Amino acid sequence: MENDAGEFVDLYCPRKCSASNRIIHAKDHASIQLCVAEVDPQTGRMTDSTKSYALCGAIRRMGESDDCIVRLTKKDGILAKNF
């Protein structure tokens, strides 16, 4: 939907599950969104960048959310590959 200025404005922007690419619908109250902050290895302080992961309720119901978070953070380089 566009307004008079030609900018896109939507009332609801659906999210996608980071693990399964399923669309998280509005009534999925079991879904979560995690924001993981990157940490400077020298100082141990949080930097300005974060990475967001959304998990749908179906993944959480199957008990696969912890494995999915580990897989996604390894892929993004937040966790070490040999973790």
Swiss-Prot record:
One GO term describing the cellular component: rough endoplasmic reticulum
Molecular function terms, GO-annotated: structural constituent of ribosome
Major subcellular location class: cytoplasm
BP GO terms, sorted: translation
Transmembrane segments: none
Keywords: Cytoplasm, Endoplasmic reticulum, Ribonucleoprotein, Ribosomal protein
InterPro entries xref list: Ribosomal_eS21, Ribosomal_eS21_CS, Ribosomal_eS21_sf
Keyword Ligase belongs to the record: no
Subcellular location: Cytoplasm, Cytosol; Cytoplasm; Rough endoplasmic reticulum
Family, per entry: Belongs to the eukaryotic ribosomal protein eS21 family.
Quaternary structure note: Component of the 40S small ribosomal subunit.
Listed name of the protein: Small ribosomal subunit protein eS21
Phylogenetic classification of the source organism: Eukaryota, Metazoa, Ecdysozoa, Arthropoda, Hexapoda
Name of encoding gene: RpS21
